[in-house]
């Protein structure tokens, strides 16, 4: 029996439940799974299970991510009052963009790292923006906050985030956004 206490919002695109399930499956199945079992598990657990099982998330192509964990970055996370269906959003993707190969040798400063990740995109974001215009409005509001390096939607939505280099600036932006969007869920996070 496994019990998970989830302290993040459901339907946020943060992959909490699915990511935890994938980790447990990986251990139980010793990292090996047939395509048919994976398809069956996805129908029960979540459409994005294979991304977590095969470590296909953002920055997964870096061999040693420890270096990047030392870079102190700060995030504000905002979830509007909408529920994005992961299955529905993924079903509308026609083509995934090719991810760039990242070299730790070329990304050796915080600014270079931020520049590289700001060039990446979320293939699901435009789909969600069309269905829920508030996502685009929220992303613009976050991006326009002083000190925000860039804003983006997480996973299949609906949580949006902004990346900041400075904790004080990020917290000020968070407080301003809470006034603009009082009914939304908010959180502050930092790299560990």
Residue ranges and their predicted role:
Residues 16-17, 153-158:
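Glycine-rich beta-strand-to-loop/alpha-helix junction loops that act as flexible
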Residues 1, 27-45, 166-177:
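Phosphate-handling active-site elements
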Residues 1-12, 29-36, 75, 79-82:
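ATP-binding N-lobe of GHMP and related small-molecule kinases
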Residues 161-163:
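Short hydrophobic/aromatic beta-strand micro-patches
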Residues 52-150, 165-178, 183, 187-192:
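Conserved, helical-rich catalytic subdomain that frames metal- and/or nucleotide-binding sites
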Residues 12-41, 51:
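DPxDG-like acidic metal-binding loop motif
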């Amino acid at each position: 029996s496994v019990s998970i206490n989830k302290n993040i919002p459901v339907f946020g695109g943060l992959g909490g439940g699915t990511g935890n399930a994938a980790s447990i499956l990986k251990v139980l199945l010793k990292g090996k799974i047939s395509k048919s079992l994976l398809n069956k598990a996805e129908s029960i657990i979540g459409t994005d299970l294979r991304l977590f099982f095969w470590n296909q998330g953002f920055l997964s192509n870096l061999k040693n991510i420890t270096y990047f964990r030392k870079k102190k970055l700060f995030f504000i996370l905002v979830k509007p009052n909408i529920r994005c269906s992961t299955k529905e959003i993924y079903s509308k993707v026609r083509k995934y963009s090719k991810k760039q190969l990242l070299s730790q040798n070329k990304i050796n400063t915080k600014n270079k790292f931020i520049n590289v990740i700001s060039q990446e995109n979320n293939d699901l974001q435009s789909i969600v923006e069309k269905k829920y215009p508030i996502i685009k409005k929220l992303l613009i509001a976050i991006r326009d906050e002083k000190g925000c390096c860039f804003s983006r939607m997480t996973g299949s939505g609906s949580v949006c985030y902004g990346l900041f280099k400075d904790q004080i600036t990020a917290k000020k932006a968070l407080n301003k956004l809470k006034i603009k969007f009082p009914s939304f869920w908010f959180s502050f996070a930092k790299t560990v």
